[in-house]
Amino acid sequence: MRLDVLEADTLVRVGWVDVWVSLYWDSPYYSEGGFTLEVRPTTENLQLLTEGRWLVRSDETPRIPMRICARANQNEDANLVLSGYPATWILTKRVSAAPIKGQNAEAAMRSLVAAAKPWPRLELGTAYGFDTTFDKQTSGGTVFAYCQTIGQACDLGFRIVLDGTGADKRLLFECFRPTFDPNNRYSPKWGNLLNAGWSFADTDYANVALVQGAGEGSQRATCWVGDVDSTGADRREIYIDARDIQPDEEKGETTASQSYLAKLADRGGQKLLAQLRTGSIEFDVDDDTLAVGDVLRVSLPQLGYTAMVRVADIITESQSSGTTRTIRLGTPSWHKT
């Protein structure tokens, strides 16, 4: 593996690194990701590895550039330590106030990127036509936060890939979602799920929200949202004070107007997005064919669980003792067996 170094704006290769003390490289599906690279503080490295430049792995397809965001030598050996993020970092530097609700997820992400102020060589890539709809509502924030919210709700990955060669290189934004390969089955009993670490929790899980807006006492605007037909132990409620949302008097809205109650329902839907069951599992594999976004069937017989789950991150760690790949799985849909 070699790390090519690209100029910040032109994307022209200005050098490469193939010797390091250590490398940590986290390739994400719809999260932040990042890297840390430690090298000797040679004159060549100090001049080559500067903030704003991009690192690209020679063994990676598609090529996902990582931006150098920070440099330091505050360590015992005074080595040069670099850290940064995938090219989707660009989207953290662009903001929007556009409301997104009931829209096609891929189209919504692409529209946000297209509407943002230009970034050198950043363009829209291929539209693959994913038909998932973002049924919730979100508004206000960085374009990255929008994409992350939409992606997590719709199981849709997003990335910025390096395309082209020489002076024709471009950064292309695209969505992606690999389909399930029945050969991707992992379990300790088959010897291909190693050093498994897991955690599950439903402490903060909620599926029904009682939202109250303007008004006082029995006249206060109130609505229920979520899985309102659920009962018993399957029903998990939260209360949301949305008094900050007021009727638009200029448009004749009152606390009983359907348009106003819809605003309260939207607030409830947004809050429920943050009240999910959590579950994660990490394990080591020797399978070099797995890629970010791949769907796996994972079994933990000792716990009586199986899950269909996506690869949320692939973490590559390289140092003098060798290279390891760790698979980090996203929040799965676990089922008792």
Report the location of each language-model feature:
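Oligomerization/assembly interface segments of phage tail-like spikes and tubes
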Residues: 26-43, 78-89, 211, 275-284, ...
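Short beta-strand-centered interaction patches in the first periplasmic/extracellular domains
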Residues: 76-81, 85-91, 126-206
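Amphipathic, non-transmembrane alpha-helical segments in extracytoplasmic/periplasmic proteins
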Residues: 37, 84, 97-123, 136-163, ...
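Solvent-exposed edge beta-strands and adjacent loop segments
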Residues: 1-30, 192-196
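N-terminal "assembly arms/tails" that initiate or stabilize quaternary assembly
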Residues: 14-54
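Acidic, small/polar-enriched beta strand-loop surface segments
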Residues: 2-3, 179-321, 333-337
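Surface-exposed cap/loop segments at beta↔alpha junctions
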Residues: 42-128
